[in-house]
Amino acid sequence: MSLSGKDKSVVKAFWDKMSPKSAEIGAEALGRMLTVYPQTKTYFSHWADVGPDSAQVKKHGATIMAAVGDAVGKIDDLVGGLSALSELHAFKLRVDPANFRILAHNIILVTAMYFPTDFTPEIHVSVDKFLQNLALALAERYR
């Protein structure tokens, strides 16, 4: 599913609104993923605590959302812009690419909770398309 010019504009504008809360959104989204999809905890077995309130989950959630913000800036070439991150996840971290979609779903959920009025159906569809394209770009090096 490709991103239209309108989708890109909507995503950029909404990112400007949500970016001040992005670290919190990322922490909660990652914490939810680790709780609801416990098989994802295997990637973080080196952490002392993978609970949703742990400092490591909060820190990595913020790191994830910083990368999402970086991807917003590279929205016209997600595959090229995220090549190094894709390579890291494919060859070093060996993350199952299905987990990118799971995390994207959780980011959508938490974003809707943080912005119940602003996260309109139009914004929802554009952000969802963006996150799905981001997940595909991250999975690119797995081929």
Curated annotation (Swiss-Prot):
Expression by tissue: Red blood cells.
Domain of life according to the entry: Eukaryota
PROSITE patterns linked to this entry: GLOBIN
One Pfam family from the record: Globin
Gene Ontology CC: one annotated term: blood microparticle
Record's keyword terms, sorted: Heme, Iron, Metal-binding, Oxygen transport, Transport
SUPFAM superfamilies documented for this protein: Globin-like (SSF46458)
UniProt cross-references to InterPro entries, sorted A to Z: Globin, Globin-like_sf, Globin/Proto, Hemoglobin_a-typ, Hemoglobin_oxygen_transport
Molecular function terms, GO-annotated: haptoglobin binding; heme binding; metal ion binding; organic acid binding; oxygen binding; oxygen carrier activity; peroxidase activity
GO biological process: hydrogen peroxide catabolic process
Keyword Amino-acid biosynthesis: no
Globin domain ranges (all copies): 2-143
Acetylation among keywords: no
Positions with a binding annotation for O2: H60
Binding locations of heme b: H89
Assembly mode: Heterotetramer of two alpha chains and two beta chains.
Similarity remark: Belongs to the globin family.
Function recorded in the entry: Involved in oxygen transport from gills to the various peripheral tissues.
Protein's name according to its UniProt entry: Hemoglobin subunit alpha-A
